[in-house]
A protein has these predicted regions:
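Conserved, well-structured ligand/cofactor-binding cores
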Residues: 1-477
Length: 477
C-alpha cells in the first residue's frame, strides 16, 4: 500500500485505486460507488447494524475453531461492535440497489471493519497484509450467506419496532371505540343510507382488523428466524468448518437477541427468498386495510359545511394556497400514499424473488431495499397517524343524531312491526315528502309514540335482534 497525507493507494485484482486516507472503506467500496449510482440513497442503518452483527458472530466463531488468531479476531469483533453501537455508519457509502447479489454491501462492511480493526491495533488503514477484509473479516463466509443473514436480522429488528407502533395504534382505535360507543349514526352501504350503527362499532372494527394484521405480521416472521449462515457460496458449506457453522449461529442468536437457528437445508435457504415475500405479503394486506380505514375517515370528515361532517379530524396545516380557511385530511391521505408505496414494493419484491436462478437469487439488493422501505414508512406513517389523527378525532354527535332521525333507512327497524309492504309505502312517502319515518308512522297510525321510542332506540337498532322485539310477543303479523 502506498499512502500520502490525503490518499492511500489500494489495489485488488482489477488494479489500483486512490482511497481517501481518512476513509474506513476501501477499493472495492469505491468501485461499487462508481458502478452503481442508482438511487442516491445509502444503506439503511438497520442493515448496517445487522451486517456488523454477522461479522462479529463470524469472528468469534472463527476464533472458536482456531482458524482466526485471537488478537485479530478480538479487534474485528470490537470494530464490528462499534458499528452496532452506531459508529462509522457514514462510511457505508454504496448504493442499496446494486449488481452482485449484495457483494458491494458485504465488502463495504468487510473493509470498514478491517480498517477500524487495523487502527485499533496501531496499524495504518489499508495494511491488509495484517488484517484483510477478505481473509480475516470474511473468513468462512460468502456474500451469499452473510448478506441474507444480515437481511433476516435487519428485517426482524425493524419488524419489532413496527409491531410496537402497531400495538399503540391499535390501542388508540380501541380507546376511540369506547369513547364513541354511545354515538349513533347512519351506516352506509354502496355509499347510500343503510341502517343505524354506532360510531364506536365502526372504530371497534378498525381495531379488530389491525389486530389481525398484527398477528399476521408476527406469524410472517417464522422463516426469518432460519438463517443460512455457513452455506457459503451455493449452500454446500465449502470453506466453513462444521464447528464454525454451529458456533456462528449460536453467537448470532446472542448478539441479535432473536431465536435464530441454522436453516435445515442450506442449499434451499441460499436459493430461495420466499421468507421475504411472506413478510411483504403481510405488510401489503395490512396497508390495504389501513388505506380503507383512511378512506372511511376522509369520507366521514368531508365538509365541513356541505359534506357529511360526521367526525372532525385534527387540523394539522392549512390546506390550500388559494382557498383561505381550507383544511385537508392530510394524515389520512398520507396513509393512503404509504399503502400505495407498500403495495408497489410488494410487487417488486415478488418479481425479485421470482428472478432467482439456480443456486442463488442475485436480486436480493432491490428486494431488501423495498422490504426495508415498506417497514420503515409503515412505522413512520402509523406513528403520526395515531398521534396527529386518531387520538384527536371528535364526533359531531348532534348532526349524527339528526342524520339518523331524517334517514329513511330506519324503516328497516320498523319493518317487522308493520310488515314489508306497509314499510315500503312509508319509505316511499318519506322520500317524496321529506317527512321523517317517525312522523309518517304516527300519521298513519301504524305505531304509537311509545312503540317508536322503543323500536328506534339507538341500542335497539344496533344489536343482533329485532328492534323492539318485546313489542312482538303478543302481536301476530
Amino acid at each position: 500500500m502506498i499512502a500520502t497525507k490525503d490518499i492511500r493507494i489500494e489495489k485488488d485484482f482489477l488494479g489500483e485505486k486512490e482511497v481517501p486516507s481518512v476513509a474506513y472503506y476501501g477499493v472495492q467500496t469505491l468501485r461499487a460507488v462508481e458502478n452503481f449510482p442508482i438511487t442516491g440513497y445509502r444503506i439503511h442503518p438497520s442493515l448496517i447494524t445487522a451486517m456488523a452483527i454477522v461479522k462479529k458472530a463470524a469472528a468469534l466463531a472463527n476464533m472458536d475453531t482456531g482458524y482466526l488468531a485471537k488478537d485479530i479476531g478480538h479487534e474485528i469483533a470490537e470494530a464490528a461492535q462499534e458499528i452496532v453501537d452506531g459508529k462509522f455508519h457514514d462510511q457505508f457509502i454504496v448504493d442499496p440497489i446494486q449488481g452482485g447479489a449484495g457483494t458491494s454491501i458485504n465488502m463495504n462492511t468487510n473493509e470498514v471493519i478491517a480498517n477500524r480493526a487495523l487502527e485499533r491495533m496501531g496499524y495504518e488503514k489499508g495494511e491488509y497484509a495484517k488484517i484483510s477484509p477478505n481473509t480475516h473479516v470474511n473468513m468462512a463466509q460468502s456474500t451469499n450467506d452473510a448478506f441474507p443473514t444480515g437481511i433476516h436480522i435487519a428485517t426482524l429488528m425493524m419488524l419489532e419496532e413496527l409491531l410496537i407502533t402497531m400495538e399503540e395504534l391499535h390501542a388508540a382505535f380501541r380507546a376511540k371505540a369506547k369513547e364513541f360507543d354511545h354515538v349513533i349514526k347512519m351506516g352506509r352501504t354502496h355509499l347510500q343510507d343503510a341502517v343505524p350503527i354506532r360510531l364506536g362499532q365502526e372504530f371497534e372494527a378498525y381495531s379488530r382488523v389491525l389486530e389481525r394484521d398484527i398477528k399476521r405480521i408476527k406469524q410472517s416472521r417464522q422463516h426469518l428466524y432460519e438463517v443460512n449462515m455457513g452455506a457459503t457460496a451455493v449452500g454446500t458449506g465449502l470453506n466453513a468448518n462444521p464447528m464454525y457453522i454451529e458456533q456462528v449461529v449460536k453467537h448470532l442468536r446472542t448478539f441479535s437477541g432473536f431465536p435464530l437457528v441454522g436453516a435445515e437445508h442450506l442449499v434451499d435457504a441460499t436459493q430461495n427468498t420466499d421468507a421475504y415475500t411472506e413478510v411483504s405479503a403481510a405488510l401489503k394486506v395490512c396497508m390495504m386495510n389501513m388505506s380503507k380505514i383512511a378512506n372511511d375517515l376522509r369520507i366521514m370528515a368531508s365538509g365541513p359545511r356541505v359534506g357529511l361532517a360526521e367526525i372532525q379530524l385534527p387540523a394539522r396545516q392549512p390546506g390550500s394556497s388559494i382557498m383561505p380557511g381550507k383544511v385537508n385530511p392530510v394524515m389520512a391521505e398520507v396513509i393512503n400514499q404509504v399503502a400505495f408505496q407498500v403495495i408497489g414494493n410488494d410487487h417488486t419484491i415478488c418479481l425479485a424473488s421470482e428472478a432467482g436462478q439456480l443456486e442463488l437469487n442475485v436480486m436480493e439488493p432491490v428486494l431488501v431495499f423495498n422490504l426495508i422501505q415498506s417497514i420503515s414508512i409503515m412505522n413512520n406513517g402509523f406513528r403520526v397517524f395515531r398521534e396527529y389523527c386518531i387520538k384527536g378525532i371528535t364526533a359531531n354527535e348532534e348532526l349524527l343524531k339528526q342524520y339518523v332521525e331524517k334517514s329513511v333507512g330506519i324503516i328497516t327497524a320498523v319493518n317487522p312491526h308493520i310488515g314489508y309492504e306497509a314499510a315500503s309505502r312509508i319509505a316511499r312517502e318519506a322520500i317524496e315528502t321529506g317527512k321523517s319515518v317517525r312522523e309518517l308512522c304516527l300519521e298513519h297510525g301504524v305505531l304509537t309514540e311509545e312503540e317508536l321510542d322503543i323500536i328506534l332506540d339507538p341500542f335497539e337498532m344496533t344489536h343482533p335482534e329485532i328492534a323492539g322485539a318485546s313489542l312482538l310477543k303478543n302481536k301476530k303479523m
